Amino acid sequence: MHLPGCPPAMADGSFSLAGHLLRSPGGSTSRLHSIEAILGFTKEDGILDTFPAERSSRGSKERDPRLGARSACPKAPAGGSESSPPAAPGLVPEFEATRPCYPKEQGEARPSPGLPVGPAAGDSKLSEEEEPPKKKHRRNRTTFTTYQLHELERAFEKSHYPDVYSREELAGKVNLPEVRVQVWFQNRRAKWRRQEKLEVSSMKLQDSPLLSFSRSPPSSALAPLGGPGSGSGPPGSALPLEPWLGPPLPGGGATALQSLPGFGPPGQGLPASYTPPPPFLNSAPLGPGLQQLGPPPAYPCAPAFGDKFSLEEAYPRNSSIAALRLKAKEHIQAIGKPWQAL
């Protein structure tokens, strides 16, 4: 036993804890008055300091099962069980003491001790995504005055596509930016195109009834023409057109020829001042029109016609349709000669 305070003993380190253990391998529990005891070092601390290799191997054995079990949280060791030695107080990070324990899934990376753990890193990304999109800047509408609109319309009448120099000159005249003038011309051209399309469509709608109306009268006008020629129409259904302008129609039935003065029953003579019209001209409205033309030069033809075909001979022949047609042709030819001379 050496007393503390002996200088030779302190110099050679005989009072170290390792030397004490070698001298007393039994590990007596009696506290010696050594330098370690005076300085406050315990026996366990001395053992830990003496065997650093054993401490590192023991700590690695306990860390390996903890890393292998990812679904369970590390629990505090029990009082009687062997636990890993406490590390130095300056090496333990503060975040490990306050970090909550969550079961880890496979493939999940463990957070590095140098970075803060928690939703702080993800919150910044979520906040950026959840922010509403910025509203598009909308330009205020330009309100044109009457003078500006008048000048712009005048320029548009001159040219629908003014060049940049004309636009700049007009912009300075109406006190507007050149960009606003350009946009106004674009809108005005679009409006002009819409108006042109509407006008074309309206003209097409108006033309369609006119075409149908213009095609219908010729088809309806064929009925009056066929009526008097065939003798089936009434005597008063004559055309309002001038009859001598059209070609003479061939003779019809016996009723049309009997209406002529020359082919009537005996006792009716031809007047000297009247020329019998063709069958399709037998209508009252056309009688005065023919009389106003003056005395026709066909007077000599009437007596010759009467001399050749007497009334007494003509009346019995009414029963013969062939004779009636022959007389009608000759009569029309005789009447057509004076009008051709005019």
Swiss-Prot record:
Q: Which residues bind DNA?
A: 137-196
Task: Say which family it is in.
Answer: Belongs to the paired homeobox family. Bicoid subfamily.
Q: What does this protein do?
A: Plays a critical role in eye formation by regulating the initial specification of retinal cells and/or their subsequent proliferation. Binds to the photoreceptor conserved element-I (PCE-1/Ret 1) in the photoreceptor cell-specific arrestin promoter.
Q: Protein name, please?
A: Retinal homeobox protein Rx
One GO cellular component term, please give it.
Answer: nucleus
Q: Which GO terms describe its molecular function?
A: DNA-binding transcription activator activity, RNA polymerase II-specific; DNA-binding transcription factor activity, RNA polymerase II-specific; RNA polymerase II cis-regulatory region sequence-specific DNA binding; sequence-specific double-stranded DNA binding
Origin species: Rattus norvegicus
Q: Which gene encodes it?
A: Rax
Q: Which residues form the signal peptide?
A: none
| UniProt-annotated location(s) | Nucleus
Motif Nuclear localization signal: where in chain: 325-329
What does the entry give for GO biological process?
A: brain development; camera-type eye development; hypothalamus development; limb development; pattern specification process; positive regulation of transcription by RNA polymerase II; regulation of transcription by RNA polymerase II
Basic and acidic residues bias (residue ranges): 55-67
Q: List the disulfide bonds.
A: none
Q: Where is the composition biased (Low complexity)?
A: 209-225, 235-244
- What positions carry the motif OAR? 319-332
Which region ranges are annotated with the description Disordered?
Answer: 49-141, 209-295
